[in-house]
Amino acid sequence: RSLVSLAQEHDLQLSVFHNRRWDADFLTLQQLLHSGELGEVYHLESHFDRFRPEVRDRWREQAVPGSGLWYDLGAHLLDQTLQLFGQPETLWLDLAQQRPGAKTDDFFHAVLQYGARRVILHASTQVAAPGARFTVHGSLGSYRKQGLDVQEEQLKSGTSPLDAQFGCDPRPGLLTTVTAQGPREQSIANLTGNYRAFYLQMVEAIQRGTPVPVKPDEVVGVMELIELGLRSAREGRRLPVGAQHLDSVVQQAPSSSPAHTAPLAMPLGQSGSTPRSTPRH
């Protein structure tokens, strides 16, 4: 909040690299929800599971402020959820240190409540055979997507963001809907991931004064939920989410914490084109 105030005071542009908004699988999920094909969404699970059984010598795995899996990946999964559904009513978080020698959390499981809807955010470092990245169940069907976004690995391997294949995830999702003739499965091709979009929008914001790609108030909202989650884990209970409650949490949070857009209403009208799909018989 101090940074936001400072940026406003000096008429500067401030944003945060929430790059997971431009993951191929998340862009595809957003468009699928907007299409209304799943109907009223009752259950969404967002997993970021990997197999990293050994603790590495790097700051994010040490007992220092801001370390741990909840800060590392929870921030992205929370931001994606807020982009889809807005602020939840309640939040419950479970944290664990599962690996031998772990100094901070390497497992989290969060439950966000939106009325009857439940959103599960989960990440672990001990999953050799990962399940789905996204699982969604609605009144008209279900959707399941395997595999993590490819852009990070492409960048590590030296692939240029200007390459035609950059951001292309060849693993389609599976949409299952129920018709009068029974279940119908469709293979849903992914939209193209595009981390460059953040930087292009940031350039426009600096040069032309257009909105930044990730608004400061959205960043503050994610941080408030991170802090609320840590309190939930410490107290072992579900906590309500609200402006007054979140203000209290942020004010009470120590300066060095120990290691450890608009809401999308469902159902939705049409908004943009539906991801390409191929029926499966």
Regions found by a protein language model. Give the residues of each.
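Short arginine-rich
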Residues: 225-235
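Predominantly a Rossmann-like dinucleotide-binding segment in NAD(P)-dependent oxidoreductases
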Residues: 12-13, 20-101, 236
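Rossmann-fold NAD(P)-binding glycine/threonine-rich loop
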Residues: 1-13
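A short glycine-threonine-serine/GTX helix/turn-capping micro-motif
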Residues: 65-71, 184-193
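Aromatic/hydrophobic pocket-lining residues that form π-stacking "cages" and hydrophobic walls in ligand
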Residues: 1-3, 29, 228-229
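Contiguous beta-strand/loop segments that form the cofactor/metal-binding neighborhood of enzyme cores
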Residues: 79-163, 187-212, 227-229, 242-281
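Short catalytic-loop micro-motif centered on adjacent basic/acidic residues
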Residues: 14-18, 120-122
